[in-house]
Amino acid sequence: MCIRDSRKAIIDLAANRIPKDRALVGDLVQAGDTVVLVTPIDTGAPKGRLILPQVQAIRELLDAHAKCLVVQQDRVAESIAELRHPPKLVMADSQVIMDVAAQTPEDIPLTTFSIQMAYSKADVIEMARGTAALASLEDGDRVLICETCSHHPQKDDIGRIKIPRWLRQKTGKDLQIEVAVGKDFPVDLTPYKVLIQCGGCVVTRRHMLMRLRAAHAQNVPMTNYGLTISYLQGVLERVLLCHPEALKAYRDALTK
């Protein structure tokens, strides 16, 4: 075998071992289904465009020959009522999930963009299991919020402001909350009680799984923004109904 053939064989072998991204929403729908996407326009929304997961969801639904209705959180109930048939799925921005859940009938599947990112980019079962660690936080526990991109923080930034505030309100504990941005992901994760990872929309599934495996190897639970927010808002079990194995993993972890 010549050097060129050897090199091609190595590249082909490596390519087969690299985990590919899963569909964000395409695995939950079929041709002809209707999906309601809830995309709030707030201070964190980019001017004149949608954020990447929202664009990705729309494209996947078009590729699946499904129909999508894009609304803000104050039009969910009205939009569902106007449909001739109930939507196959409602997918919302995590920050408005409690409001959307209140407007969505219980028999309509509900999820969030970030939870679907956990499915697409990482391992939603393992991250759901990690979410249970939030229920056992105590005073002085260290929590690490991990972001894969270095965006400019907003006035009411979700990772630096909202999640820490909601976490302290929910637990009533004096928590030490830190933020790691981009490549500043610690080698030693053992000081932390739990890791809260962003959706990872700008990185590959391989990158997210590397982080998840590093946490697992050190026995440190990892969850993500969407799972965390849904837990803090009291709707986690409902939004995990789309992923029964993840729901079971979360419930089992709570009882340990």
What are these regions (language model features)?
Residues 161:
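A solvent-exposed beta-alpha-beta segment
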Residues 172-175:
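Short beta-strand/loop segments at the ligand-binding rim of alpha/beta enzyme cores
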Residues 177-179:
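Extended, compositionally biased non-globular segments
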